[in-house]
Structures are given as C-alpha cells and as structure tokens.
Amino acid sequence: MVEVAVFLKDVWKSYRIGGKLVTVLRAVTARIYKGEIVGIHGPSGSGKTTLLRIIAGLDRPDRGEVIVDGYNLNMLDELGLAMLRNTVVSYIPQDYGLIENLTVWENVEVPLLLAGVEKSVRESRVKEVLEYMGLADKVNAIVSKLSGGERQRVAIARALVNTPTVLLADEPTANLDWENAIKVAELFKRIRDDFGTAVVIVTHDPRLLEFVDRSLNIVDGTLKEISPPISIRK
C-alpha cells in the first residue's frame, strides 16, 4: 500500500494586499504519496508558492488541515516547525537559499547543525551526500563562485542531507538553461527511486511536467488534479 507523505484538507489562505484581503488558496484538498514526483503549476499569483510554503511550515493556513509524514502542522509551535524542516521536510526556494560566502560543505552541513547532530555523524553524512550529488570535488568552493547548475545541486544536496520524507522545490529550473534543467529533473527522479522521497515541484514550465508522476494545476487558488494519483496508476 502506498503511504501518504502529505495530506491537505480544506486549506484556505488569504493575504492583505494594499488594504484588500486577497484569497490565494481556496479549499485545497490533496494527497501526495511517498515515492512520487508531483508537479504543481499554474499562472503567476495562483498560489503555487504559498501552497509549498504551507507544506513546509513556513506559512500557516487560515484554516484547514496540513499533515506531513504523520505530523499535524497545526499542532506544532514555531520551534516544532523548524525542527520538522530539519528532519522530515526540506524546502528549496527559487533563489536556492544558500549562504553565499560559505563553502559547499558548510552550506550542506547547516541542517544537521541546526538539528544538533554530532560532529562525526555530520561529517559522514555530508560526505555521503556530496558524493551522491557529484560535488565531492567542490567541497571547499565558495558558493558565490559556482555556476547556476552547480548552485542548484548544492541546494538539493543540502535538502537531502537530513534524509527528508518530503522534498519541496520552488521553480527549481527557472534560472537554468534547458540542458541543465533536464539534469535537475533526472536528478529528482533518481532521488525518488533511491530514497522513496515524495518530491513536490512548483513550475511554470510545462516541459518540466514531462518528468513528473502526477501534475496538479492551481487556478484562482483552486487545485485541480489533471493526472491520476499514484495509488490508481498502472
């Protein structure tokens, strides 16, 4: 039986913009399963990034239920949500979220430091992930000196270092040419297959949807599934 990694039930979210209350998510209900890649797409301002941030515990919904790997995010305080992001769920923002003046090794080590992992375990895990990502020769490179493709791989390595159940990526190929975008898409497929990770990608590029198992479309804050869930696919 396929396990649910993320469960969203009747999720609503509004923001006050220019003195006006704007609803960006409306009654969103969905399941995302372990071992699948889900692509979320839709027009600009449709609520894609907001939904990703809610799953990551970076934003809270106005109402509705969000459960990630069995954890009800509504029941967690800010410290609990922060710990969740260092253990269960990893979020890669569109700008990669890397610390520019640190080395590749130092950036990848950050989640383990925040989670209080002891030094010997940190060193072993960072080395393992960098080798997996093909970055073993870049450990001492300063992130600001790397190419866009290399920076994205560092961001993914950092997201993987805590062996998350759920990996969230906001427009992961937006700053890449198509050749490097394909490499990133293939990398997400390898992560899915090797670790059984649920990978959720927000994208505006319909070509990237060729690499996902299931796609969800957001229109005016409403989520519409346009391919069958993994539980019923043949």
PLM feature spans:
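Conserved ABC ATPase signature
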Residues: 142-146, 150-152
